[in-house]
Amino acid sequence: KANAFGFYPVNGIPVIDFKEHSKKEDVCDFFRQIRLHNPTKEIVLTLDNFRAHKAKDSIKCANECGIKLIFLPPYSPDLNPIEFIWKSIKRVISHTFIKDLNHLRRIIFEKFQEYAKRLSFADSWIEKFLGKKYKLNLLGF
């Protein structure tokens, strides 16, 4: 099992990391990594309601990193574009013979980097929540 944390930006540098656990300390460390890779960008992060995401320390850390958090309603992963990336990665893994944990992590890392460069996973989200004008700006129009 590979416990992966991922950041899929609309504009910015995607970040993926593997953690032993999914505790609030791990969440805070990941927030710092996101900020390190995106030092000047405004960061708005969409999260589910996992307990470590909503912990006071996690929220405090996000504020210190200048990251705005948006928590999704319960049972609504379809509102988070990164879930479509995870689903696509799981599809690849399901057709791959995995030699060991390092091999699994390498596949996840490579596919995440590949897929996170595509805005297609966020197309409908961008249009629905940010508007068509923002989408056209991202595309250079």
Please give the residue ranges for each predicted region:
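Electropositive, glycine- and tryptophan-enriched low-complexity nucleic-acid-binding patches
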Residues: 1-41
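The start of beta-strands in P-loop NTPase/AAA+ ATPase cores
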Residues: 43-44, 68
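RNase H-like polynucleotidyl transferase catalytic core
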Residues: 64-81, 98
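A general lysine-centric signal
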Residues: 1, 54, 87-90
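Acidic, metal-coordinating catalytic cores used for nucleic-acid/nucleotide bond scission
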Residues: 22, 45-59, 74-79
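Hydrophobic helix-cap positions at the C-terminus of alpha-helices
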Residues: 34-38, 61, 111
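C-terminal anion-handling pockets and recognition modules
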Residues: 82-141
